[in-house]
Design a protein with these regions (language model features):
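Non-heme Fe(II) oxygenase metal-center motifs and adjacent flexible, charged/small-residue loops
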Residues: 1-203
């Protein structure tokens, strides 16, 4: 793994993984605290959050977080998301067309270890994740021996970038915590196929 760091005018980026298995970069303080708080408040109030249920083994269970999805072609896209897109493109200049949002209401909300469904992504296009609200840990774990494990604290205003290849080699998730934590919103920018063949299990 490369131990190099990168510096930008918006924040300090740590190269977490950079090898044949993919590239992941964590940019702390990609935007300032005031802006991050404003975006959080606007999205928390304005987004039409939904509670989903999913089949697990032989029964349906509640998804332990609230979800939403917006298209970048939506003329009513909140200004905060357009501004966040501009920020995301400072780090990955891709033609993002999809925004997935998750609201973790407290420490009981989580997302299990997973990789993004590669069939629902344009090959070789990056994913950019923006964190807003409370700090939560993300656990990144290698799919193959020795199952490398990386834990990152994602704070308000942080960005995490992942390239396409990492989805084949690593899972990522937000575990539950017993700590008293406030709500957190994650904003995920992706490049989806234009043929409409995606849509199940959006995160």
């Amino acid at each position: 793994m490369s131990q190099l760091s990168l510096f930008t005018s918006q924040g300090h980026g740590e190269v977490v993984i950079d090898d044949t298995s993919g590239r992941i970069v964590h940019i702390a303080d990609a935007t300032d605290a005031v802006t991050a708080a404003r975006w959080f408040d606007q999205l928390h109030a304005a987004v039409a959050w939904r509670a989903d249920r999913r089949l697990m083994y032989d029964r349906e269970v509640d998804v332990p977080r609230l979800l939403a999805h917006r298209s970048l072609n939506d003329p009513e896209l909140p200004h905060s998301l357009r501004d966040a897109l501009t920020l995301a493109r400072r780090y990955e200049d891709a033609r993002f067309n999809s925004i997935g949002l998750n609201l973790y209401r407290d420490g009981n909300d989580s997302v299990a270890p997973h990789n993004d469904k590669v069939a629902e992504l344009v090959p070789n296009m990056p994913i950019v994740l923006l964190s807003l609200g409370a700090t939560r840990q993300m656990v990144i774990r290698g799919k193959h021996p020795p199952h490398r494990r990386i834990v990152l604290d994602l704070r308000a205003g942080d960005i995490l970038t992942m390239d396409w290849a990492t989805q084949f080699h690593y899972d990522h998730g937000i575990p539950k915590t017993r700590d008293a934590v406030g709500p957190r919103i994650s904003v995920a920018f992706r490049v989806r196929p234009s043929d409409g063949t995606w849509g199940s299990g959006r995160r």
